[in-house]
Amino acid sequence: MGEPDPLVSGQLAARRSWCLRRLGMDCEWLQLEAGTEVTIGRGLSVTYQLISKVCPLMISRSHCVLKQNPEGQWTIMDNKSLNGVWLNRERLAPLQGYCIRKGDHIQLGVPLESRETAEYEYEVIEEDWESLAPCLAPKNDQRMEKHKGSRTKRKFSSPGLENLPAEGSSDLRCPLANVASKPIEPEKLHGKGDASSQSLGCLCPGLTSLKASERAAGPHACSALPKVLELSCPKKQKACRPSASQNSLELFKVTMSRMLKLKTQMQEKQIAVLNVKRQTRKGSSKKIVRMEKELRNLQSQLYAEQAQQQARVEQLEKTFQEEAHYLQGLEKEQGECDLKQQLVQALQEHQALMEELNCSKKDFEKIIQAKNKELEQTKEEKDKVQAQKEEVLSHMNDLLENELQCIICSEYFIEAVTLNCAHSFCSFCINEWMKRKVECPICRKDIESRTNSLVLDNCISKMVDNLSSDVKERRSVLIRERRAKRLS
């Protein structure tokens, strides 16, 4: 942890300061300095850079922004992050400021399936500067200045290899988190594959083939490394031919960029699964069908990527062997040592990338298990809702048939009329009955009065709206027929 700037310490020593205390840790606290805007993310231009050790893409490049409003109160805003910002267990809407108070709980990202809590959880506190200073995390500009000047620029004298370090080894060396924050562009690698045109949903049993391809590629690449090291004796080149391994490296990089972009899409699918879980009661079967279709599409795409990756590794090994034999036959030509160092470095970087992929397999498996589990829960909830709906409709039908039918026409009441004896009939039906007898068809009492029941009509109309289209159509036909007879 870096020490705070002495000038800032002098200015803040005499007063209290707001801070985000990381739960469960006595370090990496984030100071909220008055009058400044604090940005948090995994990018390079933020105030505090957070690199997740569990899931590199959990924190977005510019995840959230904290600043003071005109009244001087601190607010937090979700800067359209992928995995969200949570204030007191409630997810914040993007690009909207929310006031925070002392004791509030702030969570960045979501917990993985195997964990109960997220990796980055904080509590809003206000303490004296002296007690906060030892626990504060260094700002990103302090960390960058500490590492400034440690980078060296490599130079190559061979014209055929001038572009290889910039396009090959440096990109291959990037860890998964850095590649995800700045994706490799295939057009810059002179590759013919279009990785960005594929819409990836999620990973499924394709991880088995990923493991097999890594086991096959790793030993081959490592076995070629000692052979190249044996040729590293200092010789001078008089002429240089274009490296035959350059094309293979470029093709390999294109495939690796696709694999890394696949992980980015996996993080998006994890959030989609969480959203589906929250919207289960409002969801429809279309979401489930779409998710299953994406699973199948991604599985086929992943198998194709695995096959291409294995082919690239085999071609790369073959090319390296050819380069080794070529170097053995070269006499004292200028730049031979640079070429061999380049080949060794490329192999080492390839091996490091394979190790990174091997470490990230567990994250892929956790995400797949979480998605499958959420999909099953969504199906179960949908079945329960459908069963409840059918039960309500069945109960409604029984109620209509038993209580709300006219005894004369055996249909649901149309313009219900209640007699003095409390029995109800259709207005049309009782009028026709009274042409023959002026007594109740049920109890045989004389009809002295009749009252229209508007409440009963409205109740029947609303209940019929939830029934089948055949019942609604039949009722509409009866209403039209009776109105026509009444007018005639």
Curated annotation (Swiss-Prot):
Residues that bear Phosphoserine: 157
Listed Basic residues bias regions: 145-156
Catalysis performed (reactions): S-ubiquitinyl-[E2 ubiquitin-conjugating enzyme]-L-cysteine + [acceptor protein]-L-lysine = [E2 ubiquitin-conjugating enzyme]-L-cysteine + N(6)-ubiquitinyl-[acceptor protein]-L-lysine
Primary location class: nucleus
Pfam families in the cross-refs: FHA, zf-C3HC4
SMART domains tied to this protein: FHA, RING
GO terms, biological process: cell division; DNA damage response; DNA repair-dependent chromatin remodeling; double-strand break repair; double-strand break repair via nonhomologous end joining; epigenetic regulation of gene expression; isotype switching; negative regulation of transcription elongation by RNA polymerase II
PTM text: Autoubiquitinated through 'Lys-48' and 'Lys-63' of ubiquitin. 'Lys-63' polyubiquitination is mediated by UBE2N. 'Lys-29'-type polyubiquitination is also observed, but it doesn't require its own functional RING-type zinc finger.
Keywords: Cell cycle, Cell division, Chromatin regulator, Chromosome, Cytoplasm, DNA damage, DNA repair, Metal-binding, Mitosis, Nucleus, Phosphoprotein, Telomere, Transferase, Ubl conjugation, Ubl conjugation pathway, Zinc, Zinc-finger
Enzyme class, UniProt record, top EC level: transferase
Domain FHA span(s) in chain numbering: 38-92
Protein's cellular compartments: Nucleus; Cytoplasm; Midbody; Chromosome, Telomere
Zinc fingers (RING-type) by residue: 406-444
Disruption phenotype: Male mice are infertile, while females do not show defects. Male mice display defects in histone H2A and H2B ubiquitination in testis cells. While meiotic sex chromosome inactivation in the XY body prior to meiosis is not affected, H4K16ac is decreased, leading to defects in the replacement of histones by protamines during spermiogenesis. Mice lacking both Rnf8 and Chfr develop thymic lymphomas and chromosomes are frequently altered, due to defects in DNA damage response and defects in damage-induced activation of ATM kinase.
UniProt xrefs under Gene3D superfamilies: 1.20.5.170, 2.60.200.20, Zinc/RING finger domain, C3HC4 (zinc finger)
Subunit-structure text: Homodimer. Forms a E2-E3 ubiquitin ligase complex composed of the RNF8 homodimer and a E2 heterodimer of UBE2N and UBE2V2. Interacts with class III E2s, including UBE2E1, UBE2E2, and UBE2E3 and with UBE2N. Interacts with RXRA. Interacts (via FHA domain) with ATM-phosphorylated MDC1. Interacts (via FHA domain) with 'Thr-4829' phosphorylated HERC2 (via C-terminus). Interacts with PIWIL1; leading to sequester RNF8 in the cytoplasm. Interacts with WRAP53/TCAB1.
Stated role: E3 ubiquitin-protein ligase that plays a key role in DNA damage signaling via 2 distinct roles: by mediating the 'Lys-63'-linked ubiquitination of histones H2A and H2AX and promoting the recruitment of DNA repair proteins at double-strand breaks (DSBs) sites, and by catalyzing 'Lys-48'-linked ubiquitination to remove target proteins from DNA damage sites.
Domain comment as written in the entry: The FHA domain specifically recognizes and binds ATM-phosphorylated MDC1 and phosphorylated HERC2. This domain is also required for proper recruitment to DNA damage sites after UV irradiation, ionizing radiation, or treatment with an alkylating agent.
Protein name (Swiss-Prot/TrEMBL): E3 ubiquitin-protein ligase RNF8
Organism from which the protein derives: Mus musculus
Highest classification ranks of the organism: Eukaryota, Metazoa, Chordata, Craniata, Vertebrata
